[in-house]
């Protein structure tokens, strides 16, 4: 766990220092007064390594014991800066305080500083709440202070605040995805979401009876095999001075555990299916960060929370359900459950809020992992402009997206003989595409929509 502290031109007697040089490792030698190591020796070694991102000096017999020199060159994107910060913080073990010194502070490098420290924070994340036995000297819960020596307190305080707001949302998502399924069932997930109300988010929860009353039968069908009841939750952020009249909508698949239902998954690696709620986790983390940052945008986050279990009352292959949209769905495979809960969620949000766009995030298909592995998420969309924006942002943040086709000719693969639509392409092939084609049928309006299949990226 990291914390940034700004101390005006003060250098503590720490064993560890991070020293930000200027371009090509050039630096002001007067800034090295905290050590008696040879300036010429350092300068010579750094010059030979001027193309590196950072360089580590270890001094076992003097203080400080370690100095990491950072090369303030221009970098291509935010992720590269974050990666450097993560690597640097990983070089320092068992430190309680780390001094951060600048040869020359450059406010034009705010983006570099921000992403460097953001990467450091993200690197130090760990999930160990259920561990009671630790290795010797394994101080993973200890707080580490990064002590920034600077006169520009306001400048670095803003960076610190922005980082804390982002990290708070990211770590909430990581915690939710990491929780074991016997702890994070749908009710427990709802309890975590309700805690966000104190940030100014408006949380509305539909329970089983409410969903049954309004006809969310596609969602309810998935949940009927589990003793843990399902929930449908909307999380609204609407500032008084919002810059958009129509909300931006984000919908997350929240299958808290997926056995496959009656169409049971293989036992091997089934434990990983606790992550089948990752899309919902992303949406909840996003909404927390938006609230902390006092976003000017009107945003609605939606999560559909269920367990997919093979109980005595479980949905059967061959069942037909009437969705919230009124369309009937023949359930040929109960392990294609994510699209069923998203069908009700998408139609409800489109009908009730008429949003500016809808983006759904779901660990939807194994087929996307076959296609893209763990490097790209699949992108499916009815709108070129929305797709382009998502792809561009993904490149900057290293959350890479690859766009797949949508075409009406795929629809025949999902047509049912006895219902309006079936939930799988029974003949096989184009698994991720036909899943997206299925979802597209549950847009009520011509709303710009993007489906992100994150099955290969979320865990």
Give residue ranges: language-model regions.
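Short amphipathic alpha-helical segment within the helicase RecA-like ATPase core
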Residues: 1-254
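A generic structural signal for tightly packed, nonpolar segments enriched in small/aliphatic residues
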Residues: 1-2, 62-63, 173, 190-459
